[in-house]
Amino acid sequence: NSDAILSASSNLPFSVSESRVEDKMKILPIPKKVRYEYHLVKVVHLSTKNHIGPAEYLCYVDANTGELLMRKNDIKFESLQANIHVEGEVYTTNPFNSSSIVDLVDLKVRHNNIDYYTDSSGQVILPSNNGNATYYLEGLYSEVRTNGNIPSFNAPASNNNILFDNTNSTISERTAFYAVNNIHSHFKSQFPTFNGLDFPIETNVDISTANCNAYYSSGTVNFYAEGGGCQSTANIPDVAYHEYGHAINDYRYNAGAGMWNGGLNEGTADIWALSLTQYPVLGEGWYLNDPNSNVREYDSILKVYPQDLVGEVHADGEIICGAFWRTYENLGSMQQALDLFIDLYDAGPDGPNGTEGIIYTDILVEFLYSDDNDGNIFNGTPNDLAIVDAFAQHGITLLSNAVLTHTELDESLQSVNIDVDANITLTYPWALDNAYCYYKVNNSNLWDSIPLSVVSGNDYSAQIPMQNSGTVVAYYLSLTDVYGKKAAVTPFSAHLDKHPNLPYFILVGYELEEEQDFDFNIGFWDVSHPSDNATTGLWEIGVPEGTFYDNIVPVQTPSQHTFQGAYCAFTGNDFTGGSIGANDVDG
């Protein structure tokens, strides 16, 4: 029997505390290919302890050869669950503020080739704590990649607390994962039944081909590495919020048709970011050497339509995002402002670049429709004053897309009333309260107003009272909507108290003595005075060459003023694409 006990305990990694051999032997059938082999066996019982607890092994030893044919533990244990908390060190604002340890939610954990995901508190329950689990910076809504690789590491499933830190990932990878999950959760809080973005969006981090930027493209969000004086853009969470906002526009706007207008796309992406942070500055800490640097700010900078519409989508988007931010400030509730905003995604106002006046006015109208509680916006809405005031601060009124056409007057006879004619085309005629001609005489600081009266159809007219010879009359035209907000000011911004544009001017009782238009009436102007020591920016007379900064912002006009003319005076044509100041008047 001692030989049977020795064979039964062979290769057992635990010491045996008790052993016995049954008196009666048994027959053990062992299946083969087409038959059974029958072995006379001794039955051996071994008592020991393994890594889980006590063990009672039943062993069958061949009575003739002494070979161990079977050994099993008769004590059955319930497998222990693994209750694991997963967290990571991230930047919650920007790298100039301290990093924080946060729960990593919706993160993938693989155990025994089965995938599990952490819950809203970073917890995951595995059915067993045996073996290793693999933790990925990938989950239900974000798949972080650096150079195509998903950060991951293994750890014993018995570890109850898992930390993503610099030993297994970079802080830009972790911050990107955290931020994308944040903005997805924010989006779902507004569109809980929409599942079109319930997938792990590819989140590419620390792209080294450029710097100082981030972008959305075809269902991916992408962040450049540190460089050029800028942070790794993945380290600034609201940059990820903005880029994911483009995904929302792509997948949800206008029943999934997407968004066409560039300014609207950028502005609404900013709205998604600001509505999550409830902070009016985007991308704060952008530059490595300046904690106050940022991408855009909406508390101290006011972009106004139409004068700040420059044809650059990010700048043009600031107008509509600013209107949203001030709607939030006026209402005092972010959720109330969001309730108005998310209705746009079904209404879908949109259009090509250059039609922002129409689109932004349509958005104002949609906000009022969303706010309305009786099916009639013409009798007002509960929060119309707050909404209209917020949009008006950014030059958006119910008449922003009105077209006011007027041929400028430059002279008048003395002692006769001055006729001012205009044509007004309205998308929302119900929104027009009145149209006015504002004028002032000579050096007066006070504007008088005269209502424009309907002549017929869309034609309007007013009369500036007769003036004496030698008088200079300044004037501009404007519409007023039913909320008292000015719109369609012509020339634009002529009504402003601070930094106004030039109004129109009428010379009363003047007679033309000489005319210099550089085309048909050439006077005695000389250019490039001999004593001028400037090397560039010299005055010339010729055909102007239009130049633009970044092919968008005008530096020199390509046009001249004289009807059917070609020439004008300018400070140097630039045909080489030089700097914007190469030919300005300072030489």
Task: For the regions a language model picked out, list residue spans one by one.
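Edge beta-strands of extracellular beta-sandwich domains
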Residues: S142-S158, K486-A494
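Extracellular glycan-recognition surfaces and repeat-rich motifs
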Residues: E511-V585
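Glycine-centered loop-to-beta-strand initiation motif
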Residues: N112-Y135, G139, N147-P151, S456-Y460
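Segments that shape or occlude catalytic/ligand-binding pockets
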Residues: N1-D103, R110, Y117, K188, ...
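Surface-exposed loop/turn motifs at beta-strand-loop junctions within extracellular Ig-like
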Residues: T48, L137-Y141, L479-Y483
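Glycan-association/targeting regions that enable binding to alpha-glucans and other polysaccharides
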Residues: I387-V527, S531-W539
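Exposed beta-strand face motif in extracellular beta-rich ectodomains
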Residues: L40-K42, A133, I363, T471-L477
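Extracellular protease catalytic domains of secreted zymogens
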Residues: P151, P156-A402
